[in-house]
Amino acid sequence: MSDDKSKALAAALAQIEKSFGKGAIMKMDGSQQEENLEVISTGSLGLDLALGVGGLPRGRIVEIFGPESSGKTTLCLEAVAQCQKNGGVCAFVDAEHAFDPVYARKLGVKVEELYLSQPDTGEQALEICDTLVRSGGIDMVVVDSVAALVPKAEIEGDMGDSHVGLQARLMSQALRKLTGHIKKTNTLVVFINQIRMKIGVMFGSPETTTGGNALKFYSSVRLDIRRTGSIKKGEEVLGNETRVKVIKNKVAPPFRQAEFDILYGEGISWEGELIDIGVKNDIINKSGAWYSYNGAKIGQGKDNVRVWLKENPEIADEIDAKIRALNGIEMHITEGTQDETDGERPEE
């Protein structure tokens, strides 16, 4: 670069720093080492691997959408439990007014430490979310759900009144404000969304999500969660077989998917995933109905092995670590804003 260009650039940089503060513009040279991406585990080993970075990225917006009763809220509560386990502070903006503390506690959520808001309007919900993010004291915020973020004008109006595009404009404005603060405070914000059907679509999928297109653009990760079957023991239904597809991913290659079981009253079957993925990666050996680890038999049949892993959490954690290392996933989970940390997985 010529001397004249260098002087002009130096003057411009000095003016920018004078106007907007030091660090407003930086050169990505050797002194500015790229930091490891911090993540919060989803509570599902398979999904952590599918995301490519070991969990949901902090400082980003994540959208989780799917049909009714597909496990959207369960997945979010599992992630909240994982965040709290590492000392993180979490908030749950319950726009649907359907939060169940008993169920959340069963999933490992420390309900007494969870900040819960049940706002009256969409504007109030998003303003609360923005204030929490800007505080810098929250590690994870869940908004459940976008479809329930009803604009104030619609609530105060009469039934049948037309309010075309109000919710989409509300989301667009809120996300413009939120994005910068989310990055600066390194907060993970998860929006749960519902599916609607587009009328008159002849080709392609007729499904769409609520709240307009803004959330699709601002989200770094979009997860499509579906129930694919039921888990039965005789005639009794014990849970759901679930598939999650990574529709969009700005931090790793997209279009991967994970399959896991969600058991009623327990949540995601982490031990079941350890068995399936462990066998696939040759960490757990399967011979007929028998499973063995490090040359020792650990049970006959998947259900018995799952119980054994629950009773031996240190072995389960060891298998988990081996699977992550084999797949090149290092857990860059930092401690939250609280001082205490707990290295054990919450009991189910």
UniProtKB/Swiss-Prot annotation:
**Annotated positions binding ATP:** G66, P67, E68, S69, S70, G71, K72, T73
One Pfam family assigned to this protein is RecA
Q: Name one GO cellular component term.
A: cytosol
Q: Which GO terms describe its molecular function?
A: ATP binding; ATP hydrolysis activity; ATP-dependent DNA damage sensor activity; damaged DNA binding; single-stranded DNA binding
Q: Which UniProt keywords apply?
A: ATP-binding, Cytoplasm, DNA damage, DNA recombination, DNA repair, DNA-binding, Nucleotide-binding, SOS response
Question: One biological process GO term for this chain?
Answer: DNA recombination
Query: Which Gene3D superfamilies does the entry link to?
Result: P-loop containing nucleotide triphosphate hydrolases
Per UniProt, subcellular location reads as: Cytoplasm
Question: What does this gene product do?
Answer: Can catalyze the hydrolysis of ATP in the presence of single-stranded DNA, the ATP-dependent uptake of single-stranded DNA by duplex DNA, and the ATP-dependent hybridization of homologous single-stranded DNAs. It interacts with LexA causing its activation and leading to its autocatalytic cleavage.
Family per record: Belongs to the RecA family.
What PANTHER family does the annotation carry?
Answer: MITOCHONDRIAL DNA REPAIR PROTEIN RECA HOMOLOG-RELATED, RECA
What name does this protein carry? Protein RecA
Q: Tell me which species this is from.
A: Neisseria meningitidis serogroup C / serotype 2a (strain ATCC 700532 / DSM 15464 / FAM18)
